[in-house]
Regions:
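Core AdoMet radical
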Residues: 1-48, 132
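Auxiliary Fe-S-binding modules of radical SAM enzymes
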Residues: 46-152
């Protein structure tokens, strides 16, 4: 029970389709589990944002993947229908790393066209609690080394 312990939730919602979640994360029931968790998080916290800083609430982060714009739109539809008035962060930072020879369809950054399709859909459908990233955020310089540098 986390009621009253968490001020801000920043959950990711990557997939809505089981075939995608199974292929990329080996989690066929990803959306079933994630959607339940999101509803519980939403129940626990109410948004308090003064225009500069969020004091409490939830921001659902969605990473747009190459060749998956229709899935991104389905996720936006889900949020609009089931978690209205929830902040959404559309992330353009996908940067392919490692050996993706088994996943050639995501072995590239998203294109401006893909990004614009999802962003325009969100704007057209009145997502007024929306954070966005620039396409330039998809750069390996933003990826930490994961070598414990700076960890006490």
């Amino acid at each position: 029970e986390l009621d009253g312990l968490i001020d801000i939730y920043l959950p990711d919602l990557k997939y809505i389709r089981p075939n995608k979640s199974m292929r990329y994360s080996k989690a066929y029931d990803y959306f079933d589990k994630a959607s339940l968790a999101l509803k519980e998080m939403r129940r626990q916290v109410k948004d308090e944002f003064d225009g500069k800083i969020m004091k409490s609430g939830m921001i659902i982060r969605h990473l747009i993947l190459p060749q998956n714009t229709n899935s991104s739109i389905e996720i936006l539809d889900y949020i609009k229908s089931n978690l209205p008035d929830t902040y959404v962060s559309l992330m353009a930072q996908y940067t392919p790393c490692g050996d993706l020879s088994d996943y050639p369809e995501i072995n590239r950054k998203i294109t401006k066209r893909e990004y614009d399709k999802v962003l325009n859909y969100a704007l057209y459908n009145s997502f007024d609690k929306l954070f966005i990233q620039e396409l330039s955020s998809a750069d390996k310089s933003f990826i930490p080394k994961f070598d414990f540098t700076g960890v006490l």
